[in-house]
């Protein structure tokens, strides 16, 4: 299958005339993050997690940039995401489906597009066998998260052998890696190590996600699966490793006006001006994915200034207190990016950066900013069959 070419400047020209709420995708920062994680992974291979449209950043530009940097193994959620990713990356990349199979019909998609699904139940093996699946699968085991994972993996391994289904590796997932001192980390890591040694020592093993790679590097095994760290959010905020935000979410100033002391702002009159003030109407709202809970507590950044969000965020707009600022109509303010990290914004809402990034919807165009020319790379190893 011929990979579709990625031309970031063409994409920019197509979207520049749209509504002035934009997410710039800084691909140089993506490469910085990838190389930072590559160094930490040492001997382990990188399986780049690009599910949910690359955490809201745009699957095509993110995956192709990583592939050009030497990454050969990617993970998405399901067969539909996998088929789309295959069209972007061509036939050489390995593509793993972390959520596995939801129905038997997906086996045909996996076969056609050379996708490597995760299996967790006997029915998955039956589906694969019935469709004469000739690819590989990953076995996912539950070591304590109580989410997706086989409870009796030794039985599934035996069944795979009986049905002549090739295993690419064995994996599990950490529940508390972003809390390094949590005792469940050791419980899961020890359980996974022992399980791997007991039932599949010959298979590649994968346990660590982004936070795990930072907190538990001794458990790298053969393959690590960074996700959020690729996009520049620090997985463990109090242990930063110098990641750079890839997405810069911005909105353009549509109007500036003076309001008098005692005036109320926006829906519900939830903000009352304590003094005469100047406000700016910005083209970004909850209809774009800006969390409405930032109303009256969040802020935007402009030339190093923090401009408070005042009044309730509307579907299409929000209001900023710009008193004393040099801000003008048509200027652009940033809601998160390098100057205002997604970790900082998430902490205001007692949430995680994942929800911010994946919450920005398709009404906001992603404008890729091309990286600087890169030196020749040594390709990272692939995991699982790619056909």
Could you describe each region identified by the protein language model?
Residues 2-27, 31, 81, 101, ...:
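Active-site anion/phosphate-binding pocket segments in diverse small-molecule metabolic enzymes
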Residues 21-24, 31-32, 39-198, 202-204, ...:
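Active-site-proximal beta-alpha core segment in soluble small-molecule metabolic enzymes
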């Amino acid at each position: 299958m011929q990979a579709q070419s990625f031309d970031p400047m063409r994409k920019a020209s197509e979207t520049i005339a749209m509504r002035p709420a934009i997410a710039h995708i800084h691909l140089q920062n993506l490469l910085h993050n990838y190389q930072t994680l590559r160094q930490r992974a040492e001997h382990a291979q990188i399986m780049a997690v690009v599910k949910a449209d690359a955490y809201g950043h745009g699957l095509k530009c993110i995956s192709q940039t990583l592939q050009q940097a030497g990454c050969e193994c990617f993970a998405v959620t399901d067969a539909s995401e996998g088929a789309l990713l295959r069209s972007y990356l061509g036939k050489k990349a390995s593509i793993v489906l972390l959520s596995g199979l939801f129905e038997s019909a997906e086996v045909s998609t996996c076969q056609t597009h050379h996708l490597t699904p995760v299996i967790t139940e006997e029915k998955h093996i039956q589906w694969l066998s019935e469709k004469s699946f000739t690819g590989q699968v990953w076995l996912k085991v539950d070591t304590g998260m109580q989410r997706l994972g086989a409870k009796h993996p030794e039985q599934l391994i035996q069944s795979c052998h009986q049905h002549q289904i090739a295993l690419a590796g064995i994996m599990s997932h950490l529940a508390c890696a972003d809390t390094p001192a949590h005792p469940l980390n050791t419980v899961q890591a020890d359980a996974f190590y022992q399980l791997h040694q007991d039932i599949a020592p010959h298979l590649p093993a994968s346990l660590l996600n982004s936070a795990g790679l930072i907190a538990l590097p001794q458990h790298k095994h053969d393959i690590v699966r960074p996700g959020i760290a690729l996009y520049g959010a620090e997985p463990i905020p109090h242990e930063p490793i110098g990641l750079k935000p890839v997405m810069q979410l911005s909105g353009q100033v549509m109007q500036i006006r003076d309001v008098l002391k005692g005036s109320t702002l926006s829906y519900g009159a939830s903000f009352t001006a304590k003094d005469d003030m100047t406000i700016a109407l910005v083209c970004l709202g909850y209809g774009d994915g800006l969390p409405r809970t930032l109303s009256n507590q969040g802020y935007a950044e402009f030339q190093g200034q923090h401009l408070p969000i005042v009044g309730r965020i509307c579907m299409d707009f929000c209001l900023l207190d710009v008193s004393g600022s040099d801000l003008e109509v048509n200027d652009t303010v940033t809601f998160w990016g390098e100057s205002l990290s997604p970790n900082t914004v998430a902490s205001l809402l007692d949430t995680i950066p994942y929800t911010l990034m994946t919450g920005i919807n398709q009404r906001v165009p992603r404008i890729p900013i091309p990286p600087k020319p890169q030196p020749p790379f040594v390709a990272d190893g692939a995991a699982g069959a790619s056909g």
